[in-house]
Amino acid sequence: MKVSVKIPATTANLGPGFDSFGLALPIFNTIIVEETIMPGTGIEINLIDETNSQDIISIPTDENNIVYKAIELLYNSIGQVPSELKITIKTQIPIARGLGSSASIIVGGLIAANELLGRPADEAALLSIATELEDHPDNITPALVGGCVVSSIEEDGSVVYSKMNWPRDWAITVCVPDYELSTSIARSVLPKEVSDRKSVV
C-alpha cells in the first residue's frame, strides 16, 4: 500500500501572535509513504528537490530524518515499530526560510502513516505528536487543518485551536532570503520577556 500526501507551507508569528498565529500558504511538500513488499529491507528515505536549490542535502536520509521520527512516534503510540517502509520527500518549500518546511513534512509523514495503519490517531492525537517534535503548534496546526489559525498547548500537552476567516481580497507576498536561518538562531535575538501590554493573552 502507498499513500501520497500534499501539505502546505505555513507562516507563523503573525503580528503579535507569537507562537500562536499561523497561516497555510499555497506552496506544497509531498510525502509518499509505502509499505515495501520484501521483509528485512528496513527504512528507505528518498529526497527529491523541486526548489532548484542545494538545501535538500542537509536533510538526513536515515533514522534521524524528522519524517521518520514522526512516523516512529505514531507507530509507538499504538505499540508498534515502523519497518519495511519507503519514504519519499518531494520538497517545494524552501528549507530554513521561515515557511514551515519541517512542520509540513512532519504533518505529511504522520497523515500518510496514519492512513497506512488504518487511521488509529484522530486529529487531536496527530496535533499532539507533531507538536512534540516542533515544540510549538503555530506552524503545525495550519499545516494540518489549513487556513488561518490561532493555537496553543494545554497543560496536558493537547493542542487547541480556532480557525479564522482570511479576507478573500488579501493577497500574500512572501520574500525568501538566499540564506538559511534556523528557528533556534532567529529566536536567540528575541527578548526573554514581553510585557502583558504587548503579548497575546
Label the model's feature ranges:
Residues 64-71, 106, 142, 172, ...:
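A general structural signal for well-ordered alpha-helical segments in protein cores
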